[in-house]
């Protein structure tokens, strides 16, 4: 599965818990060819956000599901709580396979980087070389990395699970000190960097 969609819901204060109850049911109504990968609630960063990551069999399935929920009345059952909904299309980096569903967190860091116009190819080349050592013994796994195919481009998203915030700090510090991360030539490609830490919903396949 190479095609993905990230939906970010921004909700009214003190409504996310109730919204998740509705999403547990409405996300199951997706069309065939759409698979829920993860559903998370923001913990550090911009609060009151729910991120939903879904994978698709092909572009036809992704477009069919997009049209379904855009045309349905209150498709996700949370319109009363919603301040904003952002939908983004992503394609998996060709040399990566996402982690299988299961317990990898509970902290999931979603990092989004905006790149210079010609920055995607050298970014992926650097990742292909460096991601093996960075995710090897003594460091930590990456869920996956994706490049955007709509909106403000080029940009990419990478998702990192951690058992604790202490583990995150330890691994990131050692990876830099050991010279295994960040990827070679990645800095000159960057324009902006954004990061949010999330915790999984009870029904999220990624915990």
Language model features with spans:
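Short cationic/low-complexity microdomains
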Residues: 165-179
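Glycine-rich beta-strand-turn "strand-cap" elements at beta-sheet edges
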Residues: 1-2, 10, 35-51, 71-107, ...
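Helix N-cap motif at beta-to-alpha junctions
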Residues: 15, 55-61, 116-120, 161-167
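Short amphipathic alpha-helical segments
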Residues: 15-36, 67-78, 119-144, 175-185
